[in-house]
Amino acid sequence: MANEVILLDFWPSMFGMRTRIALREKGVEFEYREEDLRNKSPLLLQMNPIHKKIPVLIHNGKPVNESIIQVQYIDEVWSHKNPILPSDPYLRAQARFWADFIDKKLYDAQRKVWATKGEEQEAGKKDFIEILKTLESELGDKPYFSGDDFGYVDIALIGFYTWFPAYEKFANFSIESEVPKLIAWVKKCLQRESVAKSLPDPEKVTEFVSELRKKFVPE
């Protein structure tokens, strides 16, 4: 049933995008509920009382929190279709390592690109580019991070792409000139229905980030 799975989310969240993609990769029907993060719903506060953050995946009334954990949960529960994590334990561990790298390194670096200015922004931009180059090196000449099949690391990373134009606008640089293979990977991912349906328009995200930046960077 469609209401068996509920996703509490916020449209420009690169973390929520992961869960949307994973559900669609598995063909799972779900009810999407947009959250107002300035006025969080009672359901969000009830289902994620520790962090009070989106996304929250609710399956048969039970919450699963943290996007990367949600992706693993979705892969395990709906295991009959489109495996997300590799079956080999070593390859699975490697995929988890790179997803963890994205969460620990990329998020903080990208935030400095759009939410700071001056020397701090330049340092953040340098870190951000180095992290993307590390990821591009790991991708190599493979179609996807795990090889021929779209999977866990791809899902962990692809949502950040929707923020790329905002990074470029506010930090005045070209991501494609720095990591062309990574952008080719982005274009390949966007051909997947699960991704295309789950990612918002990057221009709309840039408008959102423009407003958000005003709160962090006084003119």
Swiss-Prot record:
Chief localisation class: cytoplasm
GO biological process: cellular response to water deprivation; glutathione metabolic process; response to oxidative stress; toxin catabolic process
GO cellular component entries: chloroplast; chloroplast stroma; cytoplasm; cytosol; mitochondrion; plant-type vacuole; plasma membrane
Stretches assigned to the GST C-terminal domain: 88-208
Enzyme category, top tier: transferase
EC code(s) of this entry: 2.5.1.18
Localization (cell): Cytoplasm, Cytosol
Residue numbers carrying Phosphoserine: 198
Annotated positions binding glutathione: 13-14, 39-40, 53-54, 66-67
Keywords, comma-separated and alphabetical: Cytoplasm, Detoxification, Oxidoreductase, Peroxidase, Phosphoprotein, Stress response, Transferase
Catalytic activity as recorded in UniProt: RX + glutathione = an S-substituted glutathione + a halide anion + H(+)
GO MF annotation terms: glutathione binding; glutathione transferase activity; peroxidase activity
Purpose of the protein: Catalyzes the glutathionylation of 12-oxophytodienoate (OPDA). In vitro, possesses glutathione S-transferase activity toward 1-chloro-2,4-dinitrobenzene (CDNB) and benzyl isothiocyanate (BITC), and glutathione peroxidase activity toward cumene hydroperoxide.
Name listed for the protein in its UniProt record: Glutathione S-transferase U19
Phylogenetic classification of the source organism: Eukaryota, Viridiplantae, Streptophyta, Embryophyta, Tracheophyta
